[in-house]
């Protein structure tokens, strides 16, 4: 007689084994109708699997985070059900849940088209309307192999080969279609309503380009129609803001096949990059960082000693010279330790903060590359703080202030913070892990910050804090991080002399605010829709002549503005002024200055903001004053 304990502490006794659905039914018909699955002793379980012993049970509906993930996973199986009915000689690979949706990788000689997406979506809708039950079959490995051999599902058989002999495998039966999954899934298709198939893309089995080429169908699903519509609106807005499109439109950068994952910065984009670098350099200087520069190519012996050769070798670019193998650095930390190691260090010298705008290369798979967001060559705003155990909390606390200051400058007010603690496999004593985790926790709590704990998610060499931005489309971008490292200073012989005149290894804090310049600029392009605030814009002001008579004044003002340290350009084409204003607006120039006969007569410009607001008549001294104010507050002119 299982005794079921519910979240409110109440208990229900059943005479025999009982399912989640039956428990829900005993509470109320409405709850039973809404039940998708359950959590039994903190483990997710299908709604129709019997519970035989005393358990703590949480009933899951579409209102729960787990519920919507189960709905999305079930929709992935519906893709399989639909394509198997429509197309012949299809083999299903994997169909996981991803953020805001799901996908299924499919092997087929037939190439799917956007028209096929519509056809598949229509078939899914037909299947949903039949309200069929999704059956779960728990079978042995042998039975699972037999099932998928009969169906000639090559990829499923490969997955089964990797599963241990003992235990049962969950098969989910959607009428005539059978798929394999850990589950859980919805008990009936009536729970599957609000979805949309989004796009097609290519992929490889297991993400390896040497394996079979697959076709990926992406989709999204939500609990409510409004949530689906809101998401599709966000997707549409995201496409408008796509940094790759805007980068091309505004001549910021490009990427070409001869150098995949590496950026060709155009003058406009490089200006943004340089302004960003200058700003970060000022922040670093103000906070007592020492800027350094380290080599691009380093003998593999250093990477072997640091441990990167063993873990990262496949992701490194290498080159050979005079019988020596060099790695193009994928990260900066081992090189920073080499600088720390030059000369004897005392505890009185600590903390030492070494910063570098370090250019790194990583051999990312070509299929994973994505504009500025995922590249092979990137520059980190990287720094390493060498300190004592006792200094960790203060250094982390100061860094948190720095992160919030920088993010606020760019208009990011919603910051998500996650603290990752010790994993099972780790180096260092329990004592230093305790001290480090306590230091990071106190640094966060002393600032009354909301943060999320990620137990066991720290690196093997120390705990870390991650900082993620939420943008105008509610997308989350992980950018900043501060990571405690006990291991690398030991591996690379970094030492200082303590108060007792004994040599000790410092703690090293890896930290970055932006993450990488390339990715952060990509985020900014999409956040601002390329309407950069005046301090960051490639050109801060454009001067427009109304007639040919005003060209000379335009050119003279342009020279004076540029000579005073601002970024200015002119449009002196023989075009109507309305057309020029429209072109300047489409070009996203923050300030538009018009010079006609009236303005020239009083040695001034008629100024307007990018949003069309008339700012008035300005002579050059007043224009400079306004621009200085706008640049100083790092704001937009709108």
Swiss-Prot record:
One protein family per Pfam: tRNA-synt_2b
Listed EC numbers: 6.1.1.3
GO biological process: threonyl-tRNA aminoacylation
InterPro entries in the cross-refs: aa-tRNA-synt_IIb, aa-tRNA-synth_II, aa-tRNA-synth_II/BPL/LPL, Anticodon-bd, Anticodon-bd_dom_sf, Beta-grasp_dom_sf, TGS, TGS-like
Location (main, coarse): cytoplasm
SMART domains linked: tRNA_SAD
Reactions mediated catalytically: tRNA(Thr) + L-threonine + ATP = L-threonyl-tRNA(Thr) + AMP + diphosphate + H(+)
Superkingdom of the organism of origin: Bacteria
Keyword match Magnesium: no
Region (Catalytic): 242-533
Compartments where found: Cytoplasm
Cofactor binding comment, as recorded: Binds 1 zinc ion per subunit.
Name by which UniProt lists this protein: Threonine--tRNA ligase
Gene source species: Prochlorococcus marinus (strain AS9601)
Lineage: Bacteria, Bacillati, Cyanobacteriota, Cyanophyceae, Synechococcales
């Amino acid at each position: 007689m299982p005794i079921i304990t519910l979240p409110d502490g109440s208990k229900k006794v059943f005479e025999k084994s009982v399912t989640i659905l039956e428990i829900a039914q005993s509470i109320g018909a409405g709850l039973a109708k809404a039940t998708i699955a359950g959590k039994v002793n903190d483990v997710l379980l299908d709604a129709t699997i019997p519970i035989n012993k005393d358990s703590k049970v949480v009933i899951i509906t579409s209102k729960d985070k787990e519920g919507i993930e189960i709905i999305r996973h079930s929709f992935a199986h519906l893709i399989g059900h639909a394509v198997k009915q429509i197309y012949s000689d299809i083999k299903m690979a994997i169909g996981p849940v991803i953020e805001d949706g799901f996908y299924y990788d499919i092997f087929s000689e037939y190439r799917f088209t956007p028209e096929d997406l519509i056809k598949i979506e229509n078939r899914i809708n037909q299947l949903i309307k039949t309200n069929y039950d999704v059956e779960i079959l728990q079978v042995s490995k042998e039975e699972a192999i037999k099932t998928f051999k009969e169906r000639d599902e090559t990829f499923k058989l490969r997955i089964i080969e990797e599963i241990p002999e003992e235990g049962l495998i969950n098969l989910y039966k959607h009428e005539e279609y059978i798929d394999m999954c850990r589950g859980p899934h919805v008990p009936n298709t009536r729970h599957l309503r609000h979805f949309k198939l989004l796009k097609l893309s290519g992929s490889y089995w297991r993400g390896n380009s040497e394996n079979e080429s697959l076709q990926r169908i992406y989709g999204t699903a939500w609990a409510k129609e409004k949530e689906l519509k809101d998401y599709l609106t966000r997707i549409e807005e995201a496409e408008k803001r796509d940094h790759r499109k805007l980068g091309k439109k505004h001549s910021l950068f490009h990427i070409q096949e001869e150098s995949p994952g590496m950026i060709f910065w155009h003058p406009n984009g490089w200006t943004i990059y340089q302004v960003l670098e200058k700003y970060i350099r000022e922040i670093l200087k103000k906070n007592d960082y020492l800027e350094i520069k380290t080599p691009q190519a380093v003998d593999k012996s250093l990477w072997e000693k640091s441990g990167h050769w063993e873990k990262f070798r496949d992701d490194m670019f290498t080159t050979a010279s005079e019988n020596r193998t060099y790695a193009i650095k994928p990260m900066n930390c081992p090189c920073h330790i080499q600088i720390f190691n030059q000369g004897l260090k005392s505890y009185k010298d600590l903390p030492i903060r070494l910063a570098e705008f370090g250019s790194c290369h990583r051999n990312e798979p070509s299929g994973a590359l994505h504009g500025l967001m995922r590249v092979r060559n990137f520059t980190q705003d990287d720094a390493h703080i060498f300190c004592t155990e006792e200094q960790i909390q203060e250094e982390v606390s100061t860094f948190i202030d720095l992160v919030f200051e920088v993010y606020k400058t760019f208009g990011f007010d919603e910051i998500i913070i996650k603290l990752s603690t010790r994993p099972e496999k780790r180096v260092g004593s329990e004592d230093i892990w305790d001290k480090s985790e306590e230091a990071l926790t106190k640094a966060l709590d002393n600032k009354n910050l909301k943060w999320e704990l990620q137990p066991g998610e720290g690196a093997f060499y120390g705990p870390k804090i991650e900082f993620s931005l939420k943008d105008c489309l509610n997308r989350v971008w992980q950018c900043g991080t501060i990571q405690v490292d006990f291991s690398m200073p030991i591996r690379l012989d970094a030492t200082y002399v303590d108060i007792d005149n004994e040599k000790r290894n410092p703690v090293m804090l890896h930290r970055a605010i932006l993450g990488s310049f390339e990715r952060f600029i990509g985020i900014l392009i999409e956040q601002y829709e390329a309407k950069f605030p005046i301090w960051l814009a490639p050109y801060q002001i454009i001067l427009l002549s109304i007639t040919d008579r005003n060209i000379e004044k335009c050119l003279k003002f342009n020279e004076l503005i540029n000579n005073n340290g601002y970024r200015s350009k002119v449009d002196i084409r023989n075009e109507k002024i309305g057309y020029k204003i429209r072109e300047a607006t489409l070009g996203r120039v923050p300030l538009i200055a018009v010079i006609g006969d009236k303005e020239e007569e009083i040695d001034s410009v008629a100024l307007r903001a990018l949003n069309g607001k008339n700012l008035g008549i300005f002579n050059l001294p007043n224009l400079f004053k306004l621009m200085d104010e706008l640049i100083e507050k790092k704001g937009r002119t709108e």
